[in-house]
Amino acid sequence: MHLLPHSLRSLAASSAALLAAAFFLPACSSKTTGSSSSEDLLSFVDPFIGTGEHGHTFPGATRPNAMVQFSPDTHLIGWDASSGYHESDSVIYAFSLTHLSGTGIGDLGDVAILPYSGADTLRPIAQFDKTEEAASPGCYSVRLKNFGIQTELTSTDRVGLLRATYADSTDRKLLLDLGHILQPNWGHKVVGNDFRLVNDSTIVGTYYTKGWAEHHQMSYILRLSTPADSIALYRDGERQRLSAGFAVERDTADLKLHLYLPKGSAPYLVKVGLSAVSPEGAERNMQAELPDWDFEAVRTESRRIWADLLGKIRIETSDTAVLKNFYTALYHSHIAPFNYQDVDGSFRGMDKAIHKNPRPEEGHYTVFSIWDTYRALHPLLTIIDPDQALRYGKSLVSDYDEGTILPRWPLASNYTGCMPAYHSVSILADLVAKGLATSEDLRHWTEAAQRSSIYRADLAEKFAGTRELDLITRHPYYKER
């Protein structure tokens, strides 16, 4: 599940994706200028590296440690669907707002939308060619060839922005698939939906799923750049036309909303704000980060942010393959953990309650593959970004404060119980050894380490009845003292 090696391991397997990079479309291109600026380092990042074989990365738009990872879902079934995308695919089921990168298990895929045209079908599926697909840090684009739609994605930390350019003569439609899930054959499923049609350009809701994260929910607000002409809901395949004010609560049916958009030649934009707290939180996040519709401004700012981060390390070599491997790996290593907190400091804790960070500028993070990253990523950050290294450590301790133990693999306010050992303590000990912790931190963290050494079977639901749980509960070291 380690993020860095996949960029090396999957290079040969991703040759088709690398070939596609030569056909980058202008909005998502990343060309070398010949200068030594930080901006120029972006040309060495290839988001398609790792999307083949079992690298389990995705090519979509994101910012460092952002809540949003806006990316196409081309694969839904099995291990190849861990990130939602696989290099071997030629269809797109939807563009969803959250993804895991480089992990051995999949989840998320929250809030799935798809521009389409032509005949109505319950679940339209887009087709694409690799030569018409492009990605660079902060931007992804693809032509949906069976619909004749050029689709581009970019994002802020908590808001995804889609720009769709439909053919002049085509009907303009948009699917919001509230039944979308990755790896349903692994038992992952949508367990409920709240949503409300505020008006003909705004939908708010909360999406509840059961997957690797046993109890996951993501709230959202979806806004259209121009009001829809009409909106229809398919509930378990039965169609009904909606009007403003329509709402459902914890609906367990398969829900798909089809939005029929006005014709026109200008690009159509859709933005989706996220919050793990509430739809109101999603709206606040959108208002704070993307109150307007300036796609190019968002993309440009994303590139600047990534360029600044990549510029923290410079290597000297004439071998462009080494540069591409290195800077793509550095890019991948800053996708997760991601900030699970709203702009006002609110976040959903491991106890599922809502908490408020007294220092919202620091963030609260989730998606820690700790058994991989404790020995490389976290020590690296103490050198190139010690403030961020400390924020990660404090997030792990916050998980302890809310959930009573330090996590092994925290995922969206869930203890997954994944992977053995005790690596949160290694991360905290490294912060102490490098002088990044206060004396109060040391006292608090020592308490967390001691109390977390006692195995909590009730916080690892998926391991009930397994050999691992049986062994641990019989071992005298883990028994309550």
Task: Give the label of every model feature segment.
Residues 2-16:
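Bacterial N-terminal signal peptides that target proteins for export
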